């Protein structure tokens, strides 16, 4: 039997890096880890609620969290930062206030920055959110995968693989379907591969979406 390993954890320190930067005492580690999870969930839900692009999804690439003695720095990488700024005249001030309330911090102890991703359709998380939004709207999964591969192909010179599992198109029996374009060398540690898993809640049940993006640098 094959043994599966997480593509990002497999490449940490080689072609991937951590998205949380901090050190903690043993007694504080669980607290900080739980806070990081809450921060990511709050940011993603806020952007999904307040920002809708033409494709009807928020587009968060990834979130980096840095902790210092008296400061928490949150860097949000999104494909469409202008949409978030245009949504509210105060920009992301409300999200900052929600984060301060969540963490119990003063304004000077929290810093939030919004950074645009140069190639948003090269980010697997943004693509996975797009696939999920299409499946929720009952778009056939094969058409969705083909369209997503075309979107990624415009900005990616390597390869992409998309896998969707569950009751596809409302079928009685769950199955797994996948599509690939280009090269996706999962066995090569030095390969610059980004990965994302994203669940999609549909009227037929939960569908699991996995996307691998290989950048040939």
Swiss-Prot record:
Q: Which Gene3D superfamilies match?
A: 3.30.300.20, Ribosomal protein S3, C-terminal domain
Write down the InterPro entries for this protein, in alphabetical order: KH_dom-like_a/b, KH_dom_type_2, KH_sf_prok-type, Ribosomal_S3_C_sf, Ribosomal_uS3_bac-typ, Ribosomal_uS3_C
Q: Which UniProt keywords apply?
A: Chloroplast, Plastid, Ribonucleoprotein, Ribosomal protein, RNA-binding, rRNA-binding
Domain annotation KH type-2: ranges: 47-118
| Name listed for the protein in its UniProt record | Small ribosomal subunit protein uS3c
**Cell compartment(s), UniProt:** Plastid, Chloroplast
Q: Does the keyword RNA-binding apply?
A: yes
Q: Does the keyword Plastid apply?
A: yes
Family affiliation: Belongs to the universal ribosomal protein uS3 family.
A Gene Ontology molecular-function term?
A: structural constituent of ribosome
Cellular component terms, GO, for this chain's entry?
chloroplast; cytosolic small ribosomal subunit
Which segments does the entry list as coiled coil? Answer: none
- Summarize subunit and interaction data from the UniProt record for this chain: Part of the 30S ribosomal subunit.
Biological process, per Gene Ontology: translation
């Amino acid at each position: 039997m094959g043994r599966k390993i997480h593509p990002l954890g497999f490449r940490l320190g080689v072609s991937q890096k951590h998205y949380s930067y901090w050190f903690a005492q043993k007694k504080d580690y669980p607290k900080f880890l739980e806070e990081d999870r809450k921060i990511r969930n709050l940011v993603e839900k806020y952007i999904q609620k307040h920002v809708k692009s033409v494709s009807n999804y928020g587009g968060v690439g990834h979130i980096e969290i840095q902790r210092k003695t008296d400061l928490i720095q949150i860097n949000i990488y999104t494909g469409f930062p202008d949409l978030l700024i245009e949504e509210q005249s105060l920009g992301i001030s409300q999200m900052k206030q929600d984060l301060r309330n969540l963490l119990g911090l003063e304004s000077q102890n929290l810093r939030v920055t919004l950074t645009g991703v140069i190639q948003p359709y090269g980010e697997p998380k943004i693509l996975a959110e797009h696939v999920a939004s299409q499946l929720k709207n009952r778009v056939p999964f094969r058409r969705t995968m083909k369209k997503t591969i075309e979107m990624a192909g415009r900005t990616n010179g390597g390869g992409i693989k998309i896998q969707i599992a569950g009751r596809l198109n409302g079928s009685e029996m769950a199955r797994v379907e996948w599509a690939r374009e280009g090269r996706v060398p999962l066995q090569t540690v030095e390969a610059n591969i980004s990965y994302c898993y994203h669940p999609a809640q549909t009227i037929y049940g939960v569908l699991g979406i996995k996307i691998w993006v290989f950048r040939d640098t």
